[in-house]
């Protein structure tokens, strides 16, 4: 029989329902895998006792014929989702010992459907980063390595722990969040599937905020089917989140295998960058050909304001972060460092509690929101955001069903290779993904090939609002056509 940790989420679900395996043995196999993989630093907190208790409860429900959609499925939870009674840090010193008294709506949905929690996953501090190197608890190491090299690579960020854990077969799926590409970029770097749903599709209640108008939660899994299954449980209307949209949640899994014949797939000319590596361009062309072979019609389109997206994003997101992170003052919760007076306590607490990248983004955000620069920077960035959204609306009005682009401008890079001297070098990793968040659209990254160095490469599909089903159908075509990505052997333990 296949090793339990090698099962897909869908196969594990079916085996549990058919009573070929038990939830307890499935959980134990993953608990042991997590313990052996501590060199990856993917988990910030392991919860084996909780996992075993949840698995036993799942076995009892399965025996009674009361299994939920995710009954007995072991998952990792990005440590940005509040979990009642379980430490939630956002990978920051300022929240190092924070234990929430409430459960995020998304994790509550997962437990309702029978999922089992293996622990909390590492990330960039407050989800601010593209390489999982800003975590207070140290970087995540990708399970992937370049051919012939042992140099450690980034799994991407900010959801690096989620992507690494799924790729290393430590869990059957993981929750993640995406503010400017933090689901799709790590998925592309690790050969996994990551869905960033439409803004409002998944509740943000109980998820530590970075940039509230951009943040959206979604799944990272090893297959498109698994992502569809997990998204269905994560999604849904939540009255506690004022941005949550009250729409029925489709059966995303049913979209797999749906014909894409006659669909019009937009190919944005602005995404063909002069500095783009040849292998990325070649992969994109291959994806276009796969669409054509499946009966879809690739159409060149224009998204003219794409070139302004990255600078506009790095004004809007830090501005919202500056506001959101003002709550961490050492008074109500989290770290407190004494000062000579109340203002001194604020200063000392925030200086000690926030890492370098978070402080940088707070400073940028505070600057662009200040009286003398608000109109010149923040208002202008919001106007550009409106134009970016309008670009997409016009394309979809012309009958385009989805848009195909590269997911990242390169394969995974080494830890410490980028951003040390120039943070903009790191920010450029988001060049293909930020427009999706700025426009509030759904996007998915799906494995499509490997680089010359043997590392995964992904393609991105962008869809109409709340049409994740079409993205899943199209991703299934890419997944079926692309050469299978063999997950790395467990060099870590």
From Swiss-Prot:
Signal peptide as annotated in the record: none
Reactions the enzyme catalyzes: L-glutamyl-tRNA(Gln) + L-glutamine + ATP + H2O = L-glutaminyl-tRNA(Gln) + L-glutamate + ADP + phosphate + H(+)
Question: Which biological process terms from the Gene Ontology are attached to this UniProt entry?
Answer: translation
Enzyme class, one word? ligase
EC identifiers of the protein = 6.3.5.7
Query: GO CC terms on record?
Result: glutamyl-tRNA(Gln) amidotransferase complex
What Gene Ontology molecular function terms does this protein carry? ATP binding; glutaminyl-tRNA synthase (glutamine-hydrolyzing) activity
Gene3D superfamilies from the entry? Amidase signature (AS) domain
Question: What keywords appear on the UniProt entry?
Answer: ATP-binding, Ligase, Nucleotide-binding, Protein biosynthesis
Catalytic residues of the enzyme: 78, 158, 182
Q: Which family does it belong to?
A: Belongs to the amidase family. GatA subfamily.
Self-association state and partner proteins as the record states? Heterotrimer of A, B and C subunits.
What role does this protein play? Allows the formation of correctly charged Gln-tRNA(Gln) through the transamidation of misacylated Glu-tRNA(Gln) in organisms which lack glutaminyl-tRNA synthetase. The reaction takes place in the presence of glutamine and ATP through an activated gamma-phospho-Glu-tRNA(Gln).
Q: Which PANTHER family match?
A: GLUTAMYL-TRNA(GLN) AMIDOTRANSFERASE SUBUNIT A, TRANSAMIDASE
* Protein's name in the database: Glutamyl-tRNA(Gln) amidotransferase subunit A
| Origin organism lineage | Bacteria, Pseudomonadati, Pseudomonadota, Alphaproteobacteria, Hyphomicrobiales
Gene that encodes the chain: gatA
């Amino acid at each position: 029989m296949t090793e339990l940790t090698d099962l897909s989420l869908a196969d594990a679900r079916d085996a549990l329902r058919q009573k070929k395996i038990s939830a307890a043995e499935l959980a134990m196999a993953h608990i042991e895998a997590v313990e052996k993989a501590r060199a990856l630093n993917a988990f910030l907190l392991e919860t084996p006792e909780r996992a075993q208790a949840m698995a036993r409860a799942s076995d009892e429900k399965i025996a009674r014929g009361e299994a939920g959609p995710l009954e007995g499925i072991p998952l990792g939870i990005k440590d940005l989702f509040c979990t009642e009674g379980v430490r939630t840090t956002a990978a920051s010193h300022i929240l190092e010992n924070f234990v929430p008294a409430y459960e995020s709506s998304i994790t509550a949905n997962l437990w309702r459907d029978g999922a089992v929690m293996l622990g909390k996953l590492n990330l960039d501090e407050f989800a601010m980063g593209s390489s999982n190197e800003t975590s207070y608890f140290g970087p995540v190491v990708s399970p992937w390595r370049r051919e012939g090299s042992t140099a450690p690579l980034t799994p991407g960020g900010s959801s690096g722990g989620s992507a690494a854990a799924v790729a290393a077969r430590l869990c059957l799926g993981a929750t993640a969040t995406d503010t400017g590409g933090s689901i799709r970029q790590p998925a592309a770097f690790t050969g996994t599937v990551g869905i960033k749903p439409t803004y409002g599709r998944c509740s943000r209640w109980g998820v530590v905020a970075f940039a509230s108008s951009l943040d959206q939660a979604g799944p990272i899994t090893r297959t498109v089917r698994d992502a569809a299954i997990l998204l269905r449980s994560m999604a849904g209307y939540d009255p506690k989140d004022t941005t949550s949209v009250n729409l029925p949640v489709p059966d995303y899994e049913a979209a797999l295998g749906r014909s894409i014949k006659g669909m019009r797939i937009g190919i944005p000319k602005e995404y063909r960058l002069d500095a783009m590596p040849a292998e990325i361009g070649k992969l994109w062309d291959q994806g276009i050909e796969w669409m054509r072979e499946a009966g879809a019609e690739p159409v060149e389109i224009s998204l003219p304001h794409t070139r302004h997206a990255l600078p506009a994003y790095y004004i809007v997101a830090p501005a919202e972060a500056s506001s959101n992170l003002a709550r961490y003052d050492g008074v109500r919760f989290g770290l407190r460092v004494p000062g000579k007076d109340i203002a001194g306590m604020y200063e000392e607490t925030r200086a000690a509690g926030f890492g370098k990248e978070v402080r940088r983004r707070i400073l940028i955000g505070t600057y662009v929101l200040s009286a003398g620069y608000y109109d010149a920077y923040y208002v202008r960035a919001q106007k550009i955001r409106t134009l970016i959204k309008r670009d997409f609306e016009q394309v979809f009005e012309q009958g385009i069903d989805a848009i195909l682009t590269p997911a990242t401008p390169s394969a995974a890079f080494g830890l410490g290779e980028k951003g040390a001297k120039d943070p903009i070098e790191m920010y450029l990793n988001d060049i293909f993904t930020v427009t999706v968040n700025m426009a509030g659209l759904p996007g998915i990254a799906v494995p499509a090939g490997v680089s010359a160095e043997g590392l995964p490469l992904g393609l991105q599909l962008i869809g109409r609002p709340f049409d994740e089903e079409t993205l899943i159908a199209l991703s299934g075509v890419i997944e079926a056509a692309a050469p299978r990505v063999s997950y790395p052997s467990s060099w870590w333990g």
